[in-house]
Amino acid sequence: MTGSLEKEITLTFLRNFRDSPVLLKEYGPYLSYHYKVVANDGELSLNAVRICEELFNDWQNGDHTIAKEVVQCALDMWFVMKGEEYDLKGFEYIPNLIIQEIDVAKGKNTGEIHRIEFHPSTNEPIDEPLNNLILEEVEVHDFI
C-alpha cells in the first residue's frame, strides 16, 4: 500500500472509530495492522490518543452507551501506541477466548444428518463414537 493511501484509509478508520458496526465489520480483520500504522505515524498517533482519551473520559463519566467492543479496541490501540495498558475504571475486559463446557456423554442423535464412524478393524458402525473422545483442560499460561 502506498503511504498516502494507507494514511487515508487509517484516517477513515479513526474517524469512524466510535461507530462499532462500521469498525468491526469493515476493519475487523485489519485492526492490529491499523494500530501499528497509527503508532508509527506521529500525526495519526496524536489524533488517535485524543480520540482514545475522549472515549475513556466519556466511559468513566458514565456514558456506557459506547459499545464495549469499541472501548476494547481503543484499549488495544492504546497498548500498541503507548506500550502499556490504560487503567480504565469500570470496564470489564472482553477476553478473546470463548469458554464453554459441554457434556459429550449426553450427546444423542436427534434425527440430524451426521457422520457415521466405523471401527477400524471390524468395519462395523460405532454406536456412540464420542465415547472414546478425550477432552483435557489445559492452562495456556503453562505454555507461554
From Swiss-Prot:
Keywords from the UniProt entry: Nucleus
Signal peptide: none
Source domain of life: Eukaryota
Pfam families: Swm2 (PF17083)
GO biological process, any: tRNA processing
GO CC terms, sorted: nucleolus
Subcellular location: Nucleus, Nucleolus
Family assignment from sequence similarity: Belongs to the SWM2 family.
Record-given protein name: Nucleolar protein SWM2
Designated gene of the protein: SWM2
